[in-house]
Structures are given as structure tokens and as C-alpha cells.
Amino acid sequence: MSAQENSAPFLRIPPWLRTRIPCNRTYTATRELIGDLNLHTVCQSAKCPNMFECFSSRTATFLILGGTCTRNCAFCNIEPGDVLPPDAGEPQRVALAAARLELKHVVITSVTRDDLPDGGAAHFAATIQAVRSRLPRCTVEVLIPDFQGDAAALQTVLQARPDVLNHNVETPPAHYSRIRPQADYSQSLELLRRARAAGFTVKSGLMTGLGETDAEVLGVIDDLCATGCNIVTVGQYMRPSRRHPAVQRYVHPDMFEEYAAYGRARGIPHMFCAPLVRSSYNASMFVQEKN
């Protein structure tokens, strides 16, 4: 991240991004349960703006494979650093938390574990299986890393039969060297293409406000359409701290509606585009529509 990006002019947060914090007993109980079971959530680790709403409605996205990452994407609040071996008891604790929260749709994601031979794919599969064993009627969505393009690792996850396979491209390809220097845009598209070709419901997403143009956003939507992607999310990047890239622009809600209309016209059935949309925000909506 350049000094110029970090010192970009301050942009006042627009009114459509100001939300009421519905902190209540359910929020507190959800947070305490997650802590008691020694689990991580991406909601907390990434400082998601929807955390209070989601915890208050007994929903969470479970973050497996530890709380530190082997990569250092510029937008992300999850810390890079030394990582620990996978916790063999974690899949069962995720399943227990899902049962206690009475979840009907579970979202599982992870830090990126380039240190592991399979990138953590077997741990994903074990967690899916643990949730299914405890909650047979529960649908499961996984938000996976790119596994460094390892087709066998992807197949390990697919063999566990998640209901939704999510992998985010995050930003247009022209910005990867600055925003996702350890990732590869074409590799991410190939992962999505493979999952869709295998018959799975496939989802991806990106953020606005990191220096991209509207034309570039539409170009990403075109690329995702070409993979066969069923679901696309587009939301506004919010700077987690002063050490992260400054927000380059706040996209108006009307423009998000245009993104959604464009995607639907291109043939993507489910477009979720709004300033506060996040990859797993209201993730169960698609499953409800599908059923």
C-alpha cells in the first residue's frame, strides 16, 4: 500500500452507511457462546459493520483454521503472522455452536493457510460433515480461499457437498498487485468455473471504494457470469483502521442497483448489491429463495 493511498483525502461517511447498533441480550448471548467454545468469527475478526445485526439475530460466519493468516491482503483486518496447526476439535465445536444457535444455514470461512499442503481443505470438509451430522436439515455455505489453484484441494471440499461454494474475487484484476498481491484473478475465476462445472451453486463477490471504476466493476460481473456463477455480492469497502487503504469513493445506493440490474441482464440469477452487503450477510436469503 502506497503512502499516497494511506493519506488520501478523508471522505465523510455518507448517511446511507450509518446504521443503528441493535445491541441486545441475543447479541450478548451469541458473542458469549462463540467465546465459550473458543471459536473465531469473521464478523469479529474483520470488524464487519453488520456484526451487531447478525449476532442479534443469532447468525454468524464461523472462521476456522485459526485467527491469523498467511497472506496480507490490503483491505483485510485479519492479522497475518505465525499460524498454529489445525485444531482437530474445531469442526465439532462449530457444529455445537450452530446447534445451540439453532441455525438453519451455516456459513464457514477460514483464514488463508498457504502453509498447509491442502490449504486447509480437509478441515473444511470435516467441518461441513460435523455440521451435517449434528444438524441434518441445515444448509451449509463455505467461503473458501483459492488453495493456490490446487484442484485436488477444491475437490476435497466439493466431496463434502456444501450447498453453496463461495470464493470472492474481491476487486478488479488491475488492482490485484496493490490489494491482493498474493492472489491471482484468473486462478480465482478458474476455481469458480470448476465448482460450477461440477454442478454446485457458486457464489462470489467484490468491493467498491478501493480505486476501481464502475466500468471495472461491470467487467468483473461479466467475468463472473462467464464462470456460471449463480450468486454475486457487491458491497462498499469500509476502512478497518488507519493502516488500511483509505476509501477512494463511496458508491451511491442507486449505482449498486445498476450493478444488480446489469448482472441480472447478463444472466446471473441472484445479484445482492448494496453498500452494506457483505459476502455472508443474509446468506440464507438465497437458500430460502431456492426452496
Swiss-Prot record:
SUPFAM superfamilies the record matches: Radical SAM enzymes
Main subcellular location of this protein, as a coarse class: cytoplasm
Cofactor binding notes: Binds 2 [4Fe-4S] clusters per subunit. One cluster is coordinated with 3 cysteines and an exchangeable S-adenosyl-L-methionine.
GO molecular function, one term: lipoate synthase activity
Keyword check for Ubl conjugation: no
Pfam families: LIAS_N, Radical_SAM
Alphabetized UniProt keyword annotations: 4Fe-4S, Cytoplasm, Iron, Iron-sulfur, Metal-binding, S-adenosyl-L-methionine, Transferase
Name used for this protein in its record: Lipoyl synthase
Family: Belongs to the radical SAM superfamily. Lipoyl synthase family.
Species this chain originates from: Oleidesulfovibrio alaskensis (strain ATCC BAA-1058 / DSM 17464 / G20)
Reactions catalysed: [[Fe-S] cluster scaffold protein carrying a second [4Fe-4S](2+) cluster] + N(6)-octanoyl-L-lysyl-[protein] + 2 oxidized [2Fe-2S]-[ferredoxin] + 2 S-adenosyl-L-methionine + 4 H(+) = [[Fe-S] cluster scaffold protein] + N(6)-[(R)-dihydrolipoyl]-L-lysyl-[protein] + 4 Fe(3+) + 2 hydrogen sulfide + 2 5'-deoxyadenosine + 2 L-methionine + 2 reduced [2Fe-2S]-[ferredoxin]
GO cellular component: cytoplasm
Pathway(s) served: Protein modification; protein lipoylation via endogenous pathway; protein N(6)-(lipoyl)lysine from octanoyl-[acyl-carrier-protein]: step 2/2
Radical SAM core domain residues: 55-269
